[in-house]
Amino acid sequence: MKNEMWSGRFSGASDELLKEFNASLNVDKTLFNEDIQGSIAHATMLESCGILKKEELDAIIKGLEQVRSEIEQGKFVFDIKDEDIHMAIEKRLSEIIGSEIGGRLHTARSRNDQVATDFKLFVKKSHIELIKLLKELIQTMLKHAKAHKKTIMPSFTHLQHAQPVSFSFYILAYAFMLMRDIKRLQNSLELADFSPLGSCACAGTSYATNRELSAKILGFKDIMSNAMDGVSDRDFALDLLYDIAVIFTHTSRLCEEMILFSSSEFSFITISDSFSTGSSIMPQKKNPDVCELIRGKTGRVYGNLISLLTIMKALPLAYNKDMQEDKEGIFDSVKTAKDSLIILNAMLKEIQINKENMLNACKKGHMLATDLADYLVREKNIPFRKAHFIVGNVVAQAEAQGIDISEIKDLSKIDPVFDEKAMELLNFEFSLNSKQSEGSSSIASVEKQIQILEGFIQNL
């Protein structure tokens, strides 16, 4: 028996294997709210253009709201024979209000533009949700930054001690990464803010519709200017997947350092028991599973981006069934990102900063060497390359004595070019605050950085 809504031109029924293989209902039912939202906007537009009667519009809206209620309450019966959420909702609507009125809803609309509209609405909503979560994470980082302007720790290059910085300066580096993530999402949201609804299959419609009205009802800034582009565009999905991938690049780096810094080799931070797990065999273990899982989930969001890029790379215009595969990766990446940002924020709120361990770690690796070289250039007018060589010799002498250069009692005994003033440089806090360039580790600079981020957050 033929029961598909599109089966009029077919002489036989679809094979059961095809029905199951072709269906996307188990995935795209996530879009039920967006589909109902889009249908109400479309019906409202049709009524304003005289294509639907007022009583027909009222019946359609009432019926769609009943469908929404049934789905939300778990009373809606999803049947894979309905193929997708769009057909499932339309079928149920016709059961509620009758096919004579329900069948008019799809006038001047194709599933091609319907799907694209629903998907865009979901993507737009996801942008806004992710921006909110990133904002909250930045706010947590700012609290740590304000509290730890004088908490000195080593910075690293090549995972070796580089120069002393504050924990405030360190965590602000990640806050600025997240600020860029928000800006990236804002840019993508702006590009996605064009409605494809009314593009129909690919060439528009012969009905005198008002696409601008349905776009306005749905909260879009404008309409897609070309109907063929409207139904075949998935740039908005690619943009979101890329934005999420970059977010995970940043959070994965942070999580990697949280794992390292919480290890017994560093002990810079302590992760709360609330966000740690134990071992099935080793009673002493306290594992940073939150950080490890976020680091691991980075691979799946990268994979979702590559998957959609590959799906779209050679598709002829306009719509192709391949594009049915565009949603699962988005749904997965969005959920993964939201879950990860929420738990990362909760974990960071409770981390303990071990100030003494951080300071003690600064006494390894000769981190004040650059300060000495800069002093020779600035105060003794020595070319930097020569100063670099002189201080390198100081480091060699310190290592020969088994000490850090911060522990040297008299630099002039190693090289007479150093005077008493040079000894003042062998102080981590002095080193921290001696930096004068914009964006540096000094307390004054850190305070400016905090102000920049707070201003950005307030204007969101």
Curated annotation (Swiss-Prot):
Keyword Cytoplasm: yes
Compartments in which it is found: Cytoplasm
GO CC annotations, alphabetized: cytosol
Lineage top rank: taxon: Bacteria
One Gene Ontology molecular-function label: argininosuccinate lyase activity
GO biological process, one term: arginine biosynthetic process via ornithine
Alphabetical UniProt keywords: Amino-acid biosynthesis, Arginine biosynthesis, Cytoplasm, Lyase
Chief place of localization: cytoplasm
Family stated for the protein in its record: Belongs to the lyase 1 family. Argininosuccinate lyase subfamily.
Name this polypeptide is given: Argininosuccinate lyase
